[in-house]
Amino acid sequence: MVDGTYVNSSVEAISGEADTAAVAELANQMVMNFLYESSSWLAQSTGPFLWKGFRFLFLRLPSSLLVYLINGTVPFYLVVLGSVFTPIIVYLILRSRVLSAYSRLKGDNEDEVIDKKKQLVNDSEAMLMGGPDGKRRSGFSSYLDEFLSAIKIFGYLDKLVFHELTKSMRTQRLEQGEVMLLDDSVGFAIVVEGGLHIYHKIAHSQGSTRESMPLPEDRSFDSNEDDLTINGERFQLLNKVKAGNPVSSLVSILKLFTDNHTPTVVDSSKSSPKQSAQVPIRQLISPFLDGNVERNKATLNMKQVPTAEYEIPSAERAGSNVSSFTQQLYESMLPKDHAAEDVREPLPEIVAYAASDCAIAVIPASSFKRLMVKYPRSASQIIQVILTKLYRVTFQTAHSYLGLTKEIMHTEVVLNNSTNFELPYYLQEAILRKIKNGSKESSVQESIHRATLRSKNVHAHNSPTPNKISRHIALESRDQYNPGDLLSNVPLSRKGSKTASSSSVSIPRISSLRHQKEAASSPLATLRRLEGNDSQNFAPLSSSSPMSVSEKPSVVGGGAHDNISQISFSSALEETEESSWRMALVESMFGYLGITNESIMPPTEDLLFLNNRASSGSSVCSVSSYSHPQTINQDLFRCLSPELVRTKKKAPRQKYTEEMPINVDFNTAKEEFAEGLETLFIPSGATIVEQNGNNKGLYYIVSGELLVCWKNEEDNIEYVLYTVKPGGIAGYLASLIGFKSFVSLRAKTDLYVGFLPIEVLERLCDKYFMIYLKIAETLTKLLSPKILKLDYALEWIHLEASETLFNQNDPANAIYVVLNGRLRQLHQKSKNEERLSRPTTQRKKRKDDNQPNVQVVGEYSQGCSFGEVEVLTAMNRVSTVVAVRDTELARIPRTLFEVLALEHPSIMIRVSRLVAHKILQRSSDIREPTKIVNSANGYRYDFNLTIPPSAGTSSWGNNSDGGSISYKTITILPITYGLPVEEFANKLVSTFRQVGRSTIGLTQCTTLKHLGRHAFDKLANLKQSGYFAELEELYELVVYIADTPVKSSWTSTCISQGDCILLLADASSDPEIGEFERLLINNRTTARTELLLLHPERYVEPGLTHKWLRKRTWVHQHHHMQFVSSQNPSERVDSKAPPIPGAPPNLIGRLKKRERLNQLTKRTQENFARLLPDSIKLTVENISMKYIQKKQKYYTPVSAHKNDFLRLARILSGQAIGLVLGGGGARGISHLGILKAIEEHGIPIDMIGGTSIGSFVGGLYAKDYDLVPTYGRVKKFAGRIGSIWRMLSDLTWPVTSYTTGHEFNRGIWKAFGDIRIEDFWIQYYCNSTNITESMQEIHTFGYAWRYVRASMSLAGILPPITDNGNMLLDGGYLDNLPVLEMKARGCKTIFAVDVGSVDDRTPMDYGDSLNGFWIVLNRWNPFSKHPNVPSMAEIQMRLGYVASVNALEKAKTTQGVVYFRPPIEDYATLDFAKFEEIYQVGTAYGATFLHELEQNGKLPRIPGNEPANGPGIHLLHRRNSI
């Protein structure tokens, strides 16, 4: 305790003092005294215990131990051994624990290696087996499945539309040997069980000779004969239809809608028995014939005289039966009296023969007529789908593959020759004046004046006299009238004509039919009226059936109306000159399209009722005249139409209501078409449309001539098919059913044309949907017989993802052309191959169990054809072809190909050239000699000794024909929410355009904008699939951007449409499986999947990539990319946290925290600055600046050519640039100089590969993608290896090698550290020689130092490195410059640097025996003329490099390789001490070599270095405001 008197005295002293300093000093003294007395008290209490403990530990215990040891006796040899082995033991402990830290970085476990390759095996085998469960798809299981598969050709069908179409469907079984007559009366037939053989009638000119038939050896390929004889008429096999495919062709489906559109009704009361017998034989013969065909047909061998009512339908059926087309056109132009002749109706051109018992399902033709009336828009959509498939399957295959463009364009030739809608001279002059003298001001004034006149016409409609301001054009001098002429339809003031064709009948309006229906009191009254004597009401209906365009019908009118202008056009008396010729142009185009007032209106229920009457009458006639137990026309049930039944209470039915256009009127349609019409002047020689280019619209020639040209791709010669003269049209097929032109349109003279843009045509045809019916009707009548035959035999094949097209070893019975989608070609090992590769040891057996039994050969994309080789050589399929995604194909049967080859020998020549080109392109190595002689040095090389590149995943995404990457669609999919998908995708799309690929990016918004009003209805899928197929033809690459939630249908669409799927991930987030990835796995897609890891800076933490890839065995490749969203560049992307509105407070808190940390760091540096030396202080400052006070948070590359987006775009588009660095020991230091020259010339590098020292330098450059750190690490490594003392300390007993390899391992590990190859910024690989399994190993994953060390393990100097039981040595023994592996990975341009030793080709001649003493004397004799004989070690080295020498020569001659060879022959393999000298040699050579290439124009084109082609996608961002 402190004495109280002392305290009192101190207080008194303080109170007496007033000085502040004295008070402070006194307080300090008090505190010191207090501490002293407290410490003395503690010392007195604890001092004895502390002293006793100290004496025991430091005095008694050591003294007792020393006394014991000193007293003990130790032999001298133990002291010597201890002094010798103690430092050794300490060194070994330090070496194993400290200096050998690299040894803890073991290679990947064998299980991990197996799992890495397991997904590729599962993908391939699952696709081969037809499903991920390993079970092969065994086809369909029921009739219903077969039927549903066949009606996919109709596209999407609504439920009620489907029921309406199929409620009259019947099934029929055919026994073996029965024949089915395929004409329009059958309907839509589908094979649901068994198979049918389609036969085509042989022309009489060909029937007399056997030259038109296939050779006997060709027909022996099949078990059945290829010809058939019925009633003395020969038929030739055209196709074999299997279960699930339709028997009807695309044209025959269109005819089901178009033929007998307004049916003929015969009055039964007035029809005589003679007239009732005048029914064509086609309606009396059953569609099915048994073996007694001739006997049954003989009973019907009678002369039939068809009446006028059946003339037009029979003519239409004749066209559908592929008869003589030109004869059909001319007969249709003849009067009815001449067309009616006593002829015996022959069998149809197409018949179906049941090779075995089979079953078919038939939808009768009446169902299509009923569908046309009840659901006209749905029927129109079906017609659009069929027209599109007709264009894509038949026309496009005939044009691009078979070269039958002339036959396709024959349609337009017939159309222009059969009709003529030439404008009058004065209207032509008006159009020419408008084009020549027209201006914008006059156009505006004219439009204003016309609008004023139209407004006045409304008031002047009832006035007796016309307005004086209006202009009148009198048309008086006309010799003849044609459809589309101004006298018939153009509303001008003109004089009516009383002359008309005798065959013309005025057609009543639909309103009159409706009025008749309303006037009927009951359905019975309607029935009586139909059966009554007053049949004149229906005479117009019988004459209003669709007629051929070539018939040139006269003007609709008659003597009942003297002035047609006062009756038909009373609402438009006032018009201008421009509106007149516009209307005339539109009517002329309508005439070619077959559009009339009746055809533009949807059918009504009256026509349906009449159709039912006509069909029922014909069916009764058919049954009564000829009955057959297998006739499908027999009605099993007799039903009445619901319209004929009247009940007191009728339950309301749910009807499928279709959207019908408002104010559908013929005049309104003409006005809307006229508004979109344009007039153009085209100078002579100008090309309007290029061949295979996008069509722009429909052209009507007003004045001048237009050439239709076709260029043969084989001889590159352009042919003129025909000339379009004034009054004709051009672009008919491309405008109406397609969007690409098969021919070129070129102006022969100065052209004045009326132009209807395709956008206007599509918009108005969608509004007036019944136009498609007339288009289909006109088209089916104009097609040539050859195209019709081709259409019947070609098949449209639709495959879903992972569905097998054909299997390996199946008979080759067809050639396939890919319309859209993607397929993968797989090859399964045979039993002999499996027996040869069977393992012998237990370890190898476990490893081989997971080796792929299926190999990916390649892939087929849009436009590719395959199967020609097997068909021409009559061999089985050599591989299996499976669909990667939804795919459409055109199938050309072998029988059709043989028929076409006989009729058109040019097709056989064309296909043979195509096959030869594919074979040469696929196996380019075969055409090169295996043994060559270099013309430069005269040395011989054998390429048979080279090692082929590893299979791996190089074939995934590569085209099977050309070997290059051919992705048509790419999907960008995030792994989780919160990633900037759209911003990243837009930048990638812009980059694709920069590298020369026409690319379009699709988001949900852009797709919905295209779908328009169909965005959310059930037609969206149909419209969407057609839209995607069209985009794949218009653009080289389509990018699908999954910018919607995971449950959105757009996300699933993006996954199903991608040839390659890019998974977007934030590298700094948690590497767990995201919700989008789960959706990807559930969809079980087999498309190539690549992972994109986004980093804010160009640095990858060691082992980070392995964490991402370990759980994702479905990822085939990965890429590291530097990307920071521009929306918030100062923060990383947080994938888990959703966007929070209150972000600014968090930002302010982080800024305050960072400021406090900066102040603390600054004070710490100031406190230690006085105590630390300058070296340590500099180190601390560097660390502080690097990790704490980083001025620039994100690293931005200085060189623009190192853009990561450009690198990704080049890789995905097959334009990657590779760098291959060869081995050569210390000579490889020159690689640094080459890299410096490459960077200075702005050449980017996308992939790096190397061998030996090339793998070391290339790995360091791929790790950082920067030359500065690479230079420093290589120089440090060269210093360690060049140290003599380090090498001497690493020597060992030379049993396997002279050194232990420890110093070498440590030097490599010092350079790479713990990083893995997956963590490299650039894709990288190195090779090594596996002396255990005698093969080349390609290393693309694992710890970098191990496999770089394996690639640098020179035999004798370093021991082989072990990897999963295999001993690996230097890769230079097999391939010192692995260029072929780089080429197999899809690189187009490869820079190869060779620094190996020169191959010694000195000729030797020392006799048949050799004395070793003479060899020694010869080496020391300076006057000897004999070269030095190699030693045993040199011979062994040459033997080891035999394969490498030949591989090097092959790499030099590989296409796309730029070969570097620095002058480093004067330097040895171990001259690492000459680092700077060798580096300068490489720098000088690289700069000079690249400069010479650039000057001579031999430097390859670098995609991405040029400015972008076309405008990029500009994003709208929010401004950076607080």
Curated annotation (Swiss-Prot):
Swiss-Prot/TrEMBL catalytic activity: a 1-acyl-sn-glycero-3-phosphocholine + H2O = sn-glycerol 3-phosphocholine + a fatty acid + H(+)
Gene Ontology cellular component terms for the protein in this record: endoplasmic reticulum; endoplasmic reticulum membrane
Cellular location(s): Endoplasmic reticulum membrane
Chain span(s) of sequence motif GXGXXG: 1223-1228
Activity regulation, short description: Inhibited by organophosphorus esters.
SUPFAM superfamilies: cAMP-binding domain-like, FabD/lysophospholipase-like
Motif placement: DGA/G: 1370-1372
Motif residue range(s): GXSXG: 1250-1254
Assigned keywords, A-Z: Endoplasmic reticulum, Hydrolase, Lipid degradation, Lipid metabolism, Membrane, Repeat, Transmembrane, Transmembrane helix
InterPro entries: Acyl_Trfase/lysoPLipase (IPR016035), cNMP-bd_dom (IPR000595), cNMP-bd_dom_sf (IPR018490), LysoPLipase_patatin_CS (IPR001423), NTE (IPR050301), NTE1_P-loop_dom (IPR056556), PNPLA_dom (IPR002641), RmlC-like_jellyroll (IPR014710)
Compositional bias (Low complexity): 498-511, 540-555
Any one GO MF annotation of this record: lysophospholipase activity
Transmembrane segments: 74-94
UniProt binding sites for a nucleoside 3',5'-cyclic phosphate 2: 778-918
Keyword field contains Lipid metabolism: yes
Membrane topology, record value: Single-pass type I membrane protein
One of the protein's GO biological processes: phosphatidylcholine catabolic process
Enzyme Commission (EC) number: 3.1.1.5
Disordered: region residues: 443-468, 485-523, 535-556, 828-852, 1125-1145
Family statement drawn from the similarity comment of this UniProt entry: Belongs to the NTE family.
Record-given protein name: Lysophospholipase NTE1
Gene field: NTE1
